[in-house]
């Protein structure tokens, strides 16, 4: 199941961009047995393979096509739909563009691949969307839970529904929010608040579960509630304003260990049953000496009592811990002369900006270790609109010969992953409008800064 697109939301006549790169069959045979492949959102693709990106919690975006080129670069482009001359075009599942009714009888070439999901006894296909009942116990009357399935994991969003102007709204399968009759064909380009974008504080939480980036079934979830990419320097999560006019997404990943799907929400962050965390008070920051635990849907907090006597003579106070620890328990800080941020290794980020005849080519590059190479993300911007982006890779030696790059910051692999995922979303979002702010906010995701009182 997917979001339907309506042609009247677009302002220009669109022509199909169905072929990103013509690859000769002979060349394909030459690389078939080579080690060349592309990596996009942690998934490997063979040379010549095409796919639609997956955006949480909307599912597969059929209006963006990605291709793995022969040199291992990922090329993504929007599909531009032609204008139709029939009065009532219809939308076909798994396709981007609407069709005239007389042309709608054809086979769908796209195949859904990916692991299915199980939620509350129901099996959902990869990319399928559905509505969850009883997931958020403390939701407002105008909020609902929208979920989707991706590679065996369930992604859910607490969505604040926009105010409706009609007297008799109707339900549609693509959204948990009711809509006015005639608005059932939801467009991707709805109100800005209803567009999912990755935040800078995706890892800015304090629980005893490992950070979620592998999308494994046992992983925890992360709260998202931002109308645009926030700066990496702002790490506070805020619950949605139920009075706002546009929809809002608070995204979580359901822990498959707890099939009931009940969660606790604390300070804008979502925790599953049994998960523990230290509360974050605005005036004091993280309170290490108070421990909260999610019990089904209720928070149970208690004070941590430190021992009166320690096995060592001179226990030390360690940042981020409530009780003192003995010196032999203090973790070593030797990091092999590498730069670290909050215990995570950082990598240099480079930037190059070239402007000519009203067109700006902006390149963001990062140095990776596995494999040791430089990954460069290239944006083509014309009059503030992101027209095209692609990814290229080169060796470190080749990169060092380029004179026009300068280092702008250092970042972690997790922040670089957020940046990479955000490109596909911004490309879709900024199809026909100026997105200077969104692009700048996306770059800010790469900048690192400790939160209040130096906590990570």
Curated annotation (Swiss-Prot):
SMART domains: VWC. GO terms for molecular function: BMP binding. Pfam families: CHRDL_1_2_C, VWC. Keywords: Developmental protein, Glycoprotein, Repeat, Secreted, Signal. Residues 1-28 form the signal peptide. It is found in: Secreted. The keyword Oxidoreductase does not apply. A motif (Cell attachment site) lies at residues 181-183. Mainly expressed in the ventral retina. Residues 36-101, 115-181, 262-327 form the VWFC domain. One of its GO terms (biological process) is negative regulation of BMP signaling pathway. One of its GO terms (cellular component) is extracellular region. Transmembrane segments: none annotated. Seems to antagonize the function of BMP4 by binding to it and preventing its interaction with receptors. This is Chordin-like protein 1. It comes from Gallus gallus.
